[in-house]
Amino acid sequence: MRLSTIKLSGFKSFVDPTTLHLPTNMTGIVGPNGCGKSNIIDAVRWVMGESSASRLRGDSLTDVIFSGSSARKPVSQATVELIFDNSDHTISGEFASFNEISVKRLVSRDGNSAYYLNGTKCRRRDITDLFLGTGLGPRSYSIIEQGMISQIIEARPEDLRVYLEEAAGISKYKERRKETETRIRHTRENLDRLGDLREEITKQLAHLQRQARQAEQYQALQEERRIKDAEWKALEYRGLDGQLQGLREKLNQEETRLQQFIAEQRDAEARIETGRVRREESAEAVAKAQADVYQVGGALARIEQQIQHQRELSHRLHKARDEAQSQLQELTQHISGDSAKLSVLREAVAAAEPQLEQLREDHEFRQESLREAEARLADWQQRWETHNRDTGEASRAGEVERTRVDYLDRQALEADRRREALVNERAGLDLDALAEAFEQIELRHETQKTSLDGLTEQVEARKHALGGLQEQQRASQGELAEVRKQAQAARGRLSSLETLQQAALGQEQGAAVAWLKSRGLDSAARVGERISVQSGWENAVEGALGQLIEGVLVDAPEQLVDALGELGDGRIALVSSATDNANFAPTSLAAKVQGPIAIRRLLARLHTAEDLDAARTLQRSLPEGDSVITRNGERLGEGWVRVSRSGAAKQGALLRERQIQELRTQIETLQEREAELEHQLASFREQLLAAEQQREDAQRQLYMAHRSVSELAGQLQSQQGKVDAARTRIERIETDLSQLLETLDTSREQAREARAKLEDAVTLMGDLQGTREALESERRQLTDARDQARDAARGVRDAMHALALTLESQRTQIASLSQTLERMDSQRGQLDTRLEDLVAQLSEGDSPVETLEHEHQAALSERVRTERALGEARTLLDSIDSELRSFEQTRQQRDEQALAQRERISQRKLDQQALVLSAEQLSAAVVKAGFVLEDVVNGLPESANPAEWEATVGQIDGRMRRLEPVNLAAIQEYGEAAQRSEYLDAQNLDLNTALETLEEAIRKIDRETRGRFKDTFDRVNSGVQALYPRLFGGGHAYLELTGEDLLDTGVTIMARPPGKRVSSISLLSGGEKAMTAVALVFAIFQLNPAPFCLLDEVDAPLDEANVGRLANMVREMSEKVQFLFVSHNKATMEAARQLSGVTMREPGVSRLVSVDLEEAARLAGAA
C-alpha cells in the first residue's frame, strides 16, 4: 500500500483546492521558510485522526481553517483527503477488495468535524482501526516532524516503548485488554454491590425470623382477646336493658310538671305586653323633648361661630391690602429695567444681520472651488484604479497561465496511470454477492426487531404495574407507621394522665388506701371519675367540691360512719353512688353537672356566672344562704369571698378524666385501622413479589433481544457499508474513467492556449508600466490644489458659524424679555383690581356683628324652656319602666322553671338515648367480632360479673403490649427475603464465573503481548546494531529494557559514536542524536515497514557527510517504503526522484509547483 494523492482545500495556507500527486517513492518538498511546507505534514497527521491542537501548531482545532489574508477573506471549512493505492491488499478486512482507499476529514467554523471512508461518513475510531498494526497513525513512528527526531532519542523509556509496540502490531491487543479490564472492573463493582445486598439480606433474615416468632405469639393473643372482649360486651349489654325500663317511667312524670310552668309563664307575658304599649308612648314624648333641646343648642352654637368668623375676616382684609400695595410698587420697577435691555438688544441684531449674509456668500464660493478640486481628484482616482486593475489582471493572467501549463502536463500523465488502475479495480468488485448477503442479514434483523418491540412494551407495562403497586405499598406503609406512632403517643399520654389522675383523686395515700382495702373498697370509683361537667366549668366544680373530688362512691355511706374511727391518720370522704335525674335551677352549678345525686344537691345552691362582674350582680339578688361561683372558681356569698386554687397534681381532674376517656376511644380506633393496614400490606407484598418476578423475567428476555438486535444491526451496518462503498466506488470508477478520457483530449489543447496567453500577458505588463508613472505625477498636482481649496473654505465657514451663534443668542434674549414684559403688565392689572376690591370690603365696617349678638340672647332663653320639658317626660318614663321590670321578673322566674324542667326532660331523653346507643354499640362490637349476641348472652352464667371479664381483657392487653411493637407482616417478609437470598446467591455464582473467564482472557492477551514485544525488541535491537555503524561509519548502539516485566517495561537506547565513550545519550551532539534516532526509526521500518514515511527537515542538524549517508539510506529503503520529506539541503534534494515546490507569491496563500527530475533529465539529454 502506498500514498498516491494528497488533496487539500482551505487547510491552513492552502486556501485553494490543491492536489499533490506522489507517483514515486522518493518525493521531496522544497521552498523558502514560512511558505507552508510543513502544513502538508500537518494535513496528513490531521486527516489520520489527530485531536490535539498543540500538535498541529494551533490553539484550537478550528485554527487549521484558512483565516484570511490581506487580499482574501477567511473560508468556512477545511478539507483534507488522502488517496491510498491498495492494490497489494495491505489493508485487510472489509476493504481488502478495494484497490484504492480514500480517507477524508472535514471541519467547519462551528467546530463540527466529519470523517469519510471511501465517500461514506464514518467515525474517527473507524479511521484509527483501519491503520491499526500498519505503523500508520497521527502519532506513529512513520511521521517525524521538525524537532521530533531529537525528541525520539531523548524520550522517556515509557514513550520509546510505544514505537516498538506499534511496530510489533500489539496496539490492537492493548485496546482489547483495555476493554476487557473495563468489563472486569464493572464485574467486580457488580460483585461488590451484590455482596452488600447479600450481607444486608442475611441481616434481614435473622431479624425477620425473630419478628416472625413474635408475630405468631401476638396473633394467638389477639384471638383470645377477641373472644373475651365479645363476652365482656355481652355482659354489659344485659345490664343496660334493666336501666332503660326505670328511665322511661321518670320521663313521663317530668313532662306533666312542664305543662304547669308553661301556663303561668303565658299569663305574665300578657301583662308585659300591655305595659310595653304605655312605655312606647312615653318614650316618644321624651324623644320629642330631646329633639327640641338639640335644635336650640345647635342654633346657639351656629350664632357664636358666625360672630367669631366676622372678626377674623376683618383682620385678614387689612393684611391683604398692605401686601398688594407692596407687590404693585416692586413690579413697576422691574418693567422699567427690562424695557431698557430690550432696546439695546434690538439695535445689536440689526447691525449683525448684513455681516452674516456677506459671510454666507463667501462660504458658498469657497465650497464650489473645493468641489471642483475634489471632482478632478476623483476622476484621477478612477483612472488609477482602472490602471491597477488592468495591471493586476495581466499579472494574474500570466501567473495563472504559467501554473496552468505545468498543471496540465502533470494531469495528462496522472490521468493515464489512474485509468489503468481503475480498470483493474472495477474487475475485482462483486456487487451482487454483497447485496445478497445484505438482504439475508436485513431479514433476520427485522424479525428480531419486531420481537424486541413486543418485549419492550411488555417490560414497560410490567414496570408501570410494579411502580403502581410500590407506590400503593409506600403509601400504606407510611400510613401504618403514622397510625402506630399516633397509637404509641396516645398510650403514653394515657399512661401519664392516669398516673396524674390517681394522684389527684387521692389513690396514693397510704393509710386511707389500707382502710379502703380492708373493706373491699380499694377498687371503688372516685367522685372525679363518675361525674360529667359541662365544658368550661371544670375548674368551678373542682373549686366547689374541694376534697370531695377524691371521695369514694359507696352504696350506703351512713353504714360506714362507725368504721371511720379505725382510720388512724389521713383523710377520706365517702359519697353515695346513687343517681337521680332531679332538675335544678338553670343558673345553679348542679345544672351543669351529671353524676351522684349527693354531689348535685351539694351544688344546687351554688349559682354560676361568667366573670366577677356578673357574679357580683347576681349575688345581690340571691336568697339567703345561696352563693355564686365563676368559671375560674372564684366564689362569692353574702359577706364573704373564697378563691380555691388546686396544686399541679390536683388541677384539672375532671378535664383530665374526660381526656382519658377520649384517649381510650382514640386508641381503639387506631388499633382497628392498624389491623386493616397490616392486612392490606400483606396483600401488596404478595402482588409485588409476583410482579417483580414477572418484570425480571421480561427484562432478561428484553436484554437478550437487545443484544441480538445490536449484533444484527452491527452486521447490517457493516454489510450496508460494504454494499454502499462498492456501489459508490463502481459509480465513481465509471465517472472517473469517462472524465479521464476527456481530460486526456482537452489537456493538450488547453496547454497550447495557455502558452499563447502567457506571452500576451508579458507584453501587456510592459506597456502598462509607462502609464503608471504619468498617473503618479498627475496625482501630486491634483492633491496640492485640493488641499488649498479645503483650507480656504474651512476659514470662512468657522467665521460664519461664530457670527450665527452670537446672533441666535441675541434673538433668544429679545424673545424672552418680550414675554417677561407682557407677563408683568398682566400681573400689574390684576394687582390694581384686587386692591380696589379690598378697599371696598373694608368700608362695610362691623354692622353684622351687632345683629348676631341680639340673636344669641334669644337662643339662650329658648334652651332653658326646652330642658325643663325634657325632665318632666323622663320622670314619667322611669315610672313605667319600674312596673315593666316587676312583670318581667315574674315571667322570667316561670320561664326559668320551665327551662329547667325542659332540661331535666332533655337530660332524661339523653340518658335514655345514651343507654340505647351504648347497647347498640355493644351489640355491633360483638357482631363485628364474628359472634351472635343472643348466643353469647345465653352462654354466659347469670352470676357472671363484667368486671372480671374486663380484668381478663386487660391482662391479655398487657401481655400484648409487652410484645409490642409487633411486625405482623414479618412472617411473609421472612419467606420473601429467603427467596431473594437464593436469587442473589445464584447471581453471585454467575458473576464469579464471568470474572474468571475475563481474567483468563487478560492472561491470554498478556502472553501474546509479551511474546510479540520480546520478538520485536530483539529484531529492532539487531537492526539498530547493524544500521548505526553504517550511518556513523563506525561506533556501536543497542537497546536496553528498564524492567523485567515485558508488559510495562520501558526501553532506552545506548549509543557510542566512533572514537567516543559517553555514559549518557544526553551527552551526544545534536547531529549525533539525530543520526541515532534515524538508526532506530529505520530499524523499525525494516521490521514492520509502514506504507509511507514523512520526514520534516530531519537533516537540519547534520553536516554534509552525514547528510550523504542519510540520503543513501533513504534511497536504499525507498525500494520498500515510500518517503515524503521536507528539506533545505541540496544533497537531500538530489536524492529525490520528484521535487514539489511550495511558493507563497500571494501573501498568506501557498501553492504547489511539481517537477519530475527523471523526466527533466531525459528531456535535457534528448535536446
UniProtKB/Swiss-Prot annotation:
Q: Does the UniProt entry include the keyword Coiled coil?
A: yes
Domain of life per record: Bacteria
How is this protein annotated for GO cellular component?
chromosome; cytoplasm
Q: Which UniProt keywords apply?
A: ATP-binding, Coiled coil, Cytoplasm, DNA-binding, Nucleotide-binding
SMART domains named in the record: SMC_hinge
- Which Pfam families does this chain map to? SMC_hinge, SMC_N
- From the record, what ranges are coiled-coil? 170-274, 310-390, 468-500, 653-870, 982-1011
Q: Name one GO molecular function term.
A: ATP hydrolysis activity
**Role noted for this protein:** Required for chromosome condensation and partitioning.
Name listed for the protein in its UniProt record: Chromosome partition protein Smc
State the organism named in the record: Xanthomonas oryzae pv. oryzae (strain KACC10331 / KXO85)
